[in-house]
Amino acid sequence: MKTYDRNRNAIATGSMVMIAGNGTTGVIKAIHGEGKTAEQLRRADCVEIDGCEGRFCPLDLVRLGFH
């Protein structure tokens, strides 16, 4: 599954990202977007990041590298 970060860069499973609010970096483990439109997906807490607790909204992420 693919969505877009706060700068409209494509992000998908395996992408290296930074959480804009706290500067923590990690790799996307999963994007849970079943049954959501692209717009709903971009605004929902649906991204799991390796080494971080919880799910994050794509608008709170900044892509650092694309696998």
PLM feature segments, named:
Residues 1-13:
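Mixed-charge, Lys/Arg-rich low-complexity intrinsically disordered regions
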